[in-house]
């Protein structure tokens, strides 16, 4: 079985005006621009008296080498989501108002093709390979994964800050 190491985890919280559709598309486009394959693992929507509750779960995979793969899990949770109409630059625009929470979990997946799972001896070889031969390479992969995840997080924050200023 592939080795999964959670490298980085963070959460963004935001309350105010934003466009959920724009945010959804922005994140999706950004991930695909970085060559991630995005799978929506879940989407639930509940209508409550105070507004909608939505939860979206994505699994984003990026093959880096034959041995390493980046895995980013994103969970978007929205509470008290209401559709409101605002006037922006003299035009009426539909926006969303509510609470938003986005969780990013970056995971480095090693031996995702299970090439070292053939026998106990191969598993031992993988341990030696990782500990002595590619130790620095693993650290580089971890750093690059954190860097990419932070890019997604910072761009999401920048979008939300822009929406707040409008």
Name every feature range the model reports, one short phrase each.
Residues 18, 22-25, 51-53, 147, ...:
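Short, well-structured alpha-helical interface segments that form or flank functional binding sites
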Residues 1-39, 44-46, 140-141:
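Terminal, regulation- and interaction-focused segments at domain boundaries
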Residues 21, 25, 35, 96, ...:
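Detector for Asparagine
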Residues 32-96, 104:
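Hydrophobic-cavity lipid-handling domains and compact docking modules
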Residues 103-166:
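Glycine-rich, aromatic-bearing surface loops/beta-hairpins
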Residues 13-19, 59-61, 77-79, 103-109, ...:
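Solvent-exposed residues in well-ordered beta-strands and their adjoining turns
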Residues 7-11, 53, 99:
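Intrinsic-disorder/low-complexity, polar/charged segments enriched in Ser/Thr/Lys/Arg/Asp/Glu/Gln
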Residues 5, 9, 38, 56, ...:
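Generic, low-specificity signal for short hydrophobic/alpha-helical stretches with a mild N-terminal bias
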């Amino acid at each position: 079985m592939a080795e999964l190491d959670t490298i980085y985890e963070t959460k963004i919280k935001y309350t105010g005006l934003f466009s959920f559709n724009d945010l959804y598309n922005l994140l999706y486009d950004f991930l695909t621009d970085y060559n991630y394959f995005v799978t929506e693992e879940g989407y639930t929507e509940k209508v409550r008296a105070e507004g909608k509750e939505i939860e979206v779960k994505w699994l984003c995979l990026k093959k880096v080498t034959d041995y390493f793969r980046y895995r980013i899990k994103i969970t978007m949770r929205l509470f008290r989501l209401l559709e409101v109409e605002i006037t922006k630059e003299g035009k009426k625009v539909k926006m969303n108002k509510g609470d938003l929470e986005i969780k990013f979990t970056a995971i480095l997946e090693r031996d995702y093709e299970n090439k070292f799972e053939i026998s106990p001896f191969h598993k031992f070889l993988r341990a030696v390979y990782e500990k002595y031969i590619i130790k620095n390479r693993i650290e580089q992969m971890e750093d690059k994964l954190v860097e990419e995840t932070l890019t997604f997080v910072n761009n999401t924050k920048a979008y939300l800050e822009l929406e707040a200023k409008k």
